Amino acid sequence: MDIECDIRKINKLNYNNENEIYKLKKLNHPSIIKHYDIDEKKSEKNVIIYQESINGGISIDKFDNNNFFSQEVIREICEQILLALRFMDNHQIVHRDLNCSNVIIFPETLTIKIIDFGVTKTNFLNQDYQSPEVLKSNNFTHKSDIWSFGFILLKMIDKSLNNIPDDLPTEQFDFLHSCLATNLSDRLDAQTLLHHPFIINKPILRFSKSMKLISSPKKQFELVNKTEHEIILLTNGTSETFYLNKNESCKIKISTIDLYIGVRFDDGAILSSPRPTKLIEQEGTDINSFIIDQSCLMAHNITFPNISFFESISEII
């Protein structure tokens, strides 16, 4: 089956191989663009990189800050970038060219893709995005990506900002200082920043109209304010064969369909987790042996007393 992809060309005279681009082929993370193949022989002048299509996405620098980047949206985007940076750190990958034009947002689902990793000999970064150690000695580390990330956050707050304003909310102010610390030992890594109050205290976001309601089990759960609302299950996929089966046991096949846990309030308003949950296989093929991963929900201030009620999204075979 053919895969829709984009093509990136890099002039061979400016191509810094060192196997870095081949490491990228092995990365598999929802917020990092997939690199399908690299062809160094097809063109005499260019290295050809075949990568995941980003149709429907918009780079951060193309957005109108006032109309899109609310505090809630900024926190959600920051968390997704940090999750990707933590993953890269664990795989010893440094982006080297992280800036607003290299973070793509898909507005309908509020998800992101980090693109255009720096695999060239020349550093094209705007100096604002370059950490002090990069400017001084061209020394790139995972913490130089954190500095670049800090400037992305500044630009989401206000495109005109080049320094941290004093009038920011306390959590955001402290978070930015932790990203833009001149001293490397004071600059926090992605793992630590993910536990900063600016991230862990972010609210749940409103349901995207692009999602489709595929099930509404009559089950109640509690929000942190102790009011009860209806659990709903949503997806932005289109497969009609997937459904929630509560009572029957049968052979099933797990799909890669994205699932979102949602809340329907009495007035009809719907809230949803901004990122998909995961299905975990516990044992066998019994529908009752599947539960939804709770770790994706913990940051959204939602408590599920009996999450195993969602046994599975399944397809009969």
From Swiss-Prot:
Which GO terms are recorded in the biological process aspect for this UniProt protein?
intracellular signal transduction
Q: Where do transmembrane segments lie in this chain?
A: none
**Which SUPFAM superfamilies would you find in this protein's record?**
Protein kinase-like (PK-like)
Q: A Gene Ontology molecular-function term?
A: protein serine/threonine kinase activity
Q: Name one Pfam family in it.
A: Pkinase
Report which superkingdom the organism of origin falls in. Answer: Eukaryota
Q: Which GO terms describe its cellular component?
A: cytoplasm
> Which ranges carry the Protein kinase domain?
1-199
Q: What is known of its domains?
A: The protein kinase domain is predicted to be catalytically inactive.
The record's comment on protein family reads:
Belongs to the protein kinase superfamily. Ser/Thr protein kinase family.
Q: Write down what this protein is called.
A: Probable inactive serine/threonine-protein kinase DDB_G0268656
Q: What is the species of this protein?
A: Dictyostelium discoideum
Q: What is the lineage of its organism?
A: Eukaryota, Amoebozoa, Evosea, Eumycetozoa, Dictyostelia
